[in-house]
Amino acid sequence: MPGIGVILFKDGKEVYANFLGRRTVDAEHPENDKPMTRDARFRVGAVSEIFTAFTALKLQDEGKFDLIRDVGKYLGFSLKNPAYPDINITGKELLNHTSTLRDGKISSLPPAMTVLAFFRPASPYFEDGAHYARNEMPGTHFTHADLNYGLLGNIIERTTRQRFDIYQKEHIFKSLGIRADYVPANFSPEDFALLGAGYEKKDAAGNWDENADWQGAIDDFKGVQPEKDSLMLQNHAKSEQGTYSLKNSILGTNATMYAPGGGLRISADELSHALELILGNGTFRGERVLSRNDIRAMETPPIQKNENGEKISPLTYGLGEYQLLGIGTENGQSIDLVGNAGNDYGIHAGLFRRLGTRDGFIYIMNGEAISPDDPQAVSSHYGDAWQEKIINLIASTLWDAK
């Protein structure tokens, strides 16, 4: 791996931090490599969901967004699974990925498009109705979809009359002493200089090769900041990764370009502020940001019923967070964790805490040498072998230590 950083909390206080390796890599000129540091920022993937959940819950506290109401009331158009036209899709179901919405090949649309392009048969983004599960009723099945959080971004814009990224910076990040951003072009020059990249080991043809040099997969700007208010679409298909100006974007029509469920660039230090907020039950350094009930709602998976009204097993996914139950340490302890993790463009990041305690941790790793689909990279328990290795090591360090 190019670099890795961790921060550990015990009883609500930081007890350990370490940062090793490089945040940027220049294979041709290694003297230009930049070190991995506490304040180095990375695109943290699904960890971003925690902050979008913070935002949605804060809007609910202010009476601007009801999480159990039909989201069509906030989106400005009807959003129904065609197989269940009489069943509402709610904000809560967007947050916990039980909406029955599905990702297609493209999850981030250009600014000139609207999210309606995903749902209109005449649109090239409709993909023959791929954005709806055909045999699942809303609220009954979990499947992760970036589209859920893209629509939450739209709702945030329509209810606040501010751009998604700007509202989150002014009303969430500022309260936590965070200078993170979804738009690398809008960092100050000083903060942009701290931006790290995600790397993959691929050959010149783009094939995975663990003996090849590190290749930039995301945010490999090589020190050159993009033009202000511009953003590259965060789709895995390179043909759909063009860079666009945000200046003419229409508020409340397409927040997918920010990737509200994946596109946040934030440092380990700043993630530790979010962990402090969660461990403090909604307070950060003496200031109340969210309610205690908000934090409880985030960690609580839904209790679900089938079509006959019979209770089925609860999902592990709450609002922007999910549970990892029964994680084993080297000494045989069984640890229950809750949080979120990202694994995208070579970057692995996570923010977790131990249920029922004020212990938690953060990690960021910025490169992988083999394909995520390689059997060596897949974990039967976590789905991600790197996540398993990192979390098991941290869990043993935090909770097996005498």
Locate each region found by the language model.
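Short, conserved catalytic-motif segment at the N-terminal edge
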Residues: 1-42, 131
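Structural recognition of the beta-strand scaffold that forms the well-ordered cores
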Residues: 5-8, 16, 43, 93-96, ...
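Active-site SXXK
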Residues: 6, 12, 43-71, 149-157, ...
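Short, surface-exposed loop or secondary-structure junction motifs
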Residues: 24, 83-335
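Beta-propeller and closely related beta-sheet repeat lectin domains
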Residues: 42, 140, 262, 349-350
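Short, glycine/proline-biased beta-turn/loop segments that scaffold the active-site neighborhood
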Residues: 67-83, 174-176
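Short, gly/Ser/Thr-rich active-site loops of penicillin-recognizing serine hydrolases
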Residues: 280, 299-308, 312, 326, ...
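Short, well-ordered beta-strand elements
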Residues: 337-340, 348-375
